Regions:
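Short C-terminal tail/terminal secondary-structure segment
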Residues: 2, 202, 219, 230-242
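Canonical Rossmann dinucleotide-binding motif of NAD(H)/NADP(H)-dependent dehydrogenases/reductases
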Residues: 3-38
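Catalytic loop of short-chain dehydrogenase/reductase
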Residues: 15-17, 131, 136-173, 185
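Conserved NAD(P)H cofactor-binding loop of Rossmann-fold oxidoreductase domains
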Residues: 91-97, 238-239
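Substrate-binding pocket helix/loop in short-chain dehydrogenase/reductase
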Residues: 99-100, 107-109, 199
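Short, small/polar-rich loop/turn modules that mediate ligand/substrate recognition or access, typified
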Residues: 172-177, 229-231
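A conserved structural motif in NAD(P)-dependent oxidoreductases
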Residues: 203-214, 225
Length: 242
């Protein structure tokens, strides 16, 4: 077991690129809890999406996670910036709406590369470098239950569930907990008025999910009190009904 350290624990958070994003909310929450946070993002993705980029400062690490050669670099750079990493929070995604009929092979492959393959390789790199005391390692990944009209996103996100749950078993000897979070429909700026109204109507609580809702669950999982929760797919969606 490693000797205790007074240094703040270090977390890497991917998918940090917009002020209203889940990744940004998680970064803020963990900083408030005393973590040293290293953010990773890809500003070009947000510029290409309908909601666009905003004026949030650039992430500590800019990386296109579709390129497998960049993934080990994310952990290496985080170690250089902040020290040994003991939490990996995966909030990144590729999400371009399309159907079974009109999804291109290129789009499908990019969704799988970013949402599934990058998740696997980032967890792999994290586990390989983890040297903290048993019980202090954390992995949390954001998933989705989308299916129709967002097929490549939903299919590639579903793979995350299996990757992370496998990691919970395979990294148990190191004392790393691994969980998946489904935050439901979260108001990060992508909903138009009619979509937001439809989501509210399906929720047991009369509001939209906020990025802070998901961030609050992540901060609990990353706390000592979250150590007993492991290998789970957790819903933090306010009771969203199909």
């Amino acid at each position: 077991m490693s000797a205790p350290s007074d240094d703040p624990p270090v977390a890497v958070i991917t998918g940090v690129g917009r002020s209203r994003g889940i990744g940004t909310a998680v970064a803020s929450a963990l900083r408030d809890d005393g973590w040293r946070v290293v953010t990773a993002g890809w500003r070009r993705y947000d510029r290409l999406m309908p909601w666009g980029a905003d004026d949030i400062p650039l992430a500590d690490i800019e990386a296109d996670l579709a390129d497998p050669s960049t993934l080990a670099m994310v952990l290496e750079r985080a170690n250089e910036l902040a020290g040994p990493v003991c939490a990996m929070i995966l909030c990144h995604c590729e999400s371009v709406d399309s159907t079974i009929l009109d999804t291109s092979v290129e789009s499908f492959d990019r969704h799988v590369a970013i949402n599934a393959r990058a998740t696997w390789l980032l967890i792999k790199a994290f586990v390989e470098q983890f040297a903290g005391p048993p019980g202090t390692g954390r992995v949390a990944a954001i998933t989705s239950d989308h299916t129709a009209f967002n097929m490549p996103y939903g299919a590639s996100k579903a793979a995350i569930d299996r990757i992370v749950l496998a990691a919970a078993v395979e990294s148990a000897a190191l004392g790393i907990t691994c969980n998946v979070i489904n935050p439901g429909a979260t108001d990060t700026g992508w909903m138009d008025f009619s979509t937001a109204a439809a989501v509210r109507a399906r929720n047991l609580q009369p509001r939209l999910g906020a990025p802070a809702d998901c961030a609050n669950l992540v901060r609990f999982l990353c706390s000592p009190n979250g150590q007993w929760i492991n290998g789970q797919l957790l819903y933090s969606d306010g009771g969203l009904r199909p």
